[in-house]
């Protein structure tokens, strides 16, 4: 059984709700043939609520989903004249309980679409709380989310010709728990078709469930990392530790620690702080990594 639940959090959200979906691409099943023996099942699934949002956010909304058992995805495509051939698999955060689909998914796709980058936003399976039951352990849950993220990469590779993207320039990244998921996938051994060319990790959660010893024996993609110094949910210490591990293992990496920007700043549009420069700095980094050459996508 599936039910959508909506909780309005302020008058501006009611206005935004009327326009929801106007510029969003089609939502598609990540696993159209179903997931065999899917361990993630909810009596009430795909529950949605709305949260306050940044008026300058590209999506103009902030929907948050929980109890996701049937993962889906959305593809954002740039116009042909802007297309750089670079693509991203975007993993929104939400502590694995939720998916902040607009703030850390659609907003990213909409923004980078204008800069010539294709984005596939994944609404992956969640480890949401069910009354009277304990949540799965991270060890039990994580392989399911990793499988969803990996399928996002494989979809882009399979559709590379139709999407006019370079299969060797597919990046993977995410926000908060989505950043943790991206790192976990990059550390996993799922075959070349599921490995990204680079990663982007925005205030990633790095507190547990990651074995950095693997970096000594397995390649890790070049990484772009962003975090705010005031962040208490995903503290700077975790990013510093991870960055140090990457450097020690000679993985090309760039870390940006901003003096302002608490957890969940997303694109940081309209903050007036240096934090809002990270999305364009990411484009510069892609040029440094020779993923983007010049011209289209220039920020």
Positions of predicted regions on the chain:
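Serine-hydrolase catalytic machinery in alpha/beta-hydrolase-like enzymes
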Residues: 39-65, 69-74, 79-84, 88, ...
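C-terminal catalytic histidine-bearing segment of alpha/beta-hydrolase fold enzymes
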Residues: 249-299
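Positively charged n-region of N-terminal signal peptides that target proteins for export
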Residues: 1-7
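Primarily recognizes the serine-hydrolase "nucleophile elbow" in alpha/beta-hydrolase
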Residues: 143-219
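Alpha/beta-hydrolase-fold catalytic nucleophile elbow
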Residues: 123, 173, 200-203, 226, ...
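Glycine-rich His-Gly loop
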Residues: 91-95, 176, 204, 228-229
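The feature captures the conserved acid-bearing segment of alpha/beta-hydrolase catalytic domains
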Residues: 197-249, 254
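N-terminal targeting or regulatory segments adjacent to alpha/beta-hydrolase or S9 domains
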Residues: 7-13, 19-61, 65, 298-299
